[in-house]
């Protein structure tokens, strides 16, 4: 994979170079010391992946991410020395299209390969996404066997650009919205709680992490909160699971949508928002095949038109709508 590094700290650049050297398939194609340089270099030679710092002179990583995704789009992972201190900047960058975030590997760590492992795992996952490898063949959902009372559910999946898209969508819904909402966003579990808090603050709705064994409930907004998949069980409750292991990116939107298609006992709408790759497209198709309404975000309003495009290509979306029209549509569907 051709990788670029954007960081103004020589020690951080060296730490990243050493970490990448553990995988000979990775090649550093250029290094920029600030965001403005990165925008320029990316236009001249667009890499497969950029490892982007947040705080830099001239232009920071948030603005650089915005510019690059608008002008020379490619996969971007935020690499920072203190994720928790920079949580709001991280979500800003993800709103502009960054895919993930990871700590800068420690230079001179006792076990250098172990220190590099989290970064290399992220890069492996990103490679799977940008490669857009074919999805596994999925069987049709099993007949509904849930004895849970009938309710309404909105199942939402998002990836690159998702935080900002979710903010817009949730802002358009009232606090007494008539359906349960479950969000599956590609975000590391370290950041899931922070993202729930950020979405709560930004949208005005109460957003919290989904708990093992709880059912979706009307008026509640639940966010998948671990690096395992989240799925609906036939008794109507939510569960985290490591299976299927062949779904590399976790949590998988496909896994959740498929479980809704199989086991949800009530009205439901599937919504697939901005994101890179194909995750969610097949699951959305299964929801549509089961008679549920499905919505994909349109190209013009998507930060990254990958997942919604894949859904549109296979006929998974009943409707394709601009982001700002999705919440009004949900209000129409679930009007009290």
UniProtKB/Swiss-Prot annotation:
The record's catalysed reaction(s) read: [protein]-L-glutamate 5-O-methyl ester + H2O = L-glutamyl-[protein] + methanol + H(+); L-glutaminyl-[protein] + H2O = L-glutamyl-[protein] + NH4(+)
Q: Name one GO biological process term.
A: chemotaxis
Report the locations given in the UniProt record.
Cytoplasm
Give a yes or no for keyword Phosphoprotein in this entry.
yes
- Tell me which SUPFAM superfamilies the record gives: CheY-like, Methylesterase CheB, C-terminal domain
Q: What class of enzyme is it?
A: hydrolase
- Fetch the InterPro entries from UniProt: CheB-like, CheB_C, CheY-like_superfamily, Sig_transdc_resp-reg_Me-estase, Sig_transdc_resp-reg_receiver
Q: Mostly located where?
A: cytoplasm
4-aspartylphosphate PTM sites in chain numbering: 53
What the entry says about domains is: Contains a C-terminal catalytic domain, and an N-terminal region which modulates catalytic activity.
Q: Which UniProt keywords apply?
A: Chemotaxis, Cytoplasm, Hydrolase, Phosphoprotein
Looking at the record, the residues that make up the Response regulatory domain are 2-119
Which HAMAP family is this protein grouped with? CheB_chemtxs
CDD domains, per the entry: CheB_Rec, REC_CheB-like
One GO cellular component this record assigns the protein to is: cytoplasm
Q: What does this protein do?
A: Involved in chemotaxis. Part of a chemotaxis signal transduction system that modulates chemotaxis in response to various stimuli. Catalyzes the demethylation of specific methylglutamate residues introduced into the chemoreceptors (methyl-accepting chemotaxis proteins or MCP) by CheR. Also mediates the irreversible deamidation of specific glutamine residues to glutamic acid.
Q: So where's the catalytic machinery, residue-wise? A: 159, 186, 279
Question: In Gene Ontology terms, what is one molecular function of this protein?
Answer: protein-glutamate methylesterase activity
Mind telling me which NCBIfam families this protein's record contains? PRK00742.1 (NF001965), PRK12555.1 (NF009206)
Protein name per its UniProtKB record:
Protein-glutamate methylesterase/protein-glutamine glutaminase 1
Q: Which Pfam families match?
A: CheB_methylest, Response_reg
As for PTM, the annotation reads: Phosphorylated by CheA. Phosphorylation of the N-terminal regulatory domain activates the methylesterase activity.
Belongs to which family? Belongs to the CheB family.
Its Enzyme Commission number? Answer: 3.1.1.61, 3.5.1.44
The UniProt record lists the CheB-type methylesterase domain at 143-336
């Amino acid at each position: 994979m051709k990788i670029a590094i954007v960081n103004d700290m020589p020690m951080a650049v060296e730490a990243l170079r050493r970490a990448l050297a553990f995988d000979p398939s990775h090649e550093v194609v250029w290094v920029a010391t600030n965001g403005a340089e990165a925008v320029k270099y990316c236009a001249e030679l667009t890499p497969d992946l950029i490892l982007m710092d947040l705080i830099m002179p001239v232009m920071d990583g948030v603005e650089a991410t915005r510019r690059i995704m608008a002008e020379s789009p490619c996969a971007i992972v935020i690499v920072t020395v203190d994720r928790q201190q920079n949580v709001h900047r991280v979500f800003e960058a993800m709103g502009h299209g960054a895919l993930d975030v990871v700590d800068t590997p420690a230079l001179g760590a006792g076990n250098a390969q172990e220190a590099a492992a989290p970064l290399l795992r992220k890069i492996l996952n990103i490679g799977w996404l940008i490669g857009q490898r074919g999805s596994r063949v999925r069987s049709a959902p099993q007949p509904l066997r849930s004895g849970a009372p009938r309710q309404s559910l909105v199942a939402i999946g998002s990836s690159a650009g998702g935080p900002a898209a979710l903010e817009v969508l949730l802002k358009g819904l009232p606090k007494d919205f008539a359906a349960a909402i479950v969000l599956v966003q590609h975000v590391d579990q370290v950041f899931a709680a922070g993202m729930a808090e950020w979405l709560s603050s930004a949208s005005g709705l109460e957003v919290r992490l989904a708990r093992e064994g709880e059912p979706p409930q009307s008026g509640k907004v639940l966010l998948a909160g671990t690096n395992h998949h989240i799925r609906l069980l036939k008794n109507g409750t939510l569960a985290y699971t490591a299976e299927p292991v062949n779904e590399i990116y976790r949590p998988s939107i496909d896994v959740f949508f498929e479980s809704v298609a199989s086991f949800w006992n009530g009205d439901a709408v599937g919504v697939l928002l901005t994101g890179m790759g194909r995750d969610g497209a097949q699951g959305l198709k299964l929801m549509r095949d089961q008679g549920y309404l499905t919505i994909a975000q349109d190209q013009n309003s998507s930060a990254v038109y990958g997942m919604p495009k894949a859904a549109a290509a296979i006929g998974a979306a009943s409707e394709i709508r601009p982001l700002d029209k999705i919440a009004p549509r949900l209000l129409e569907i679930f009007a009290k």
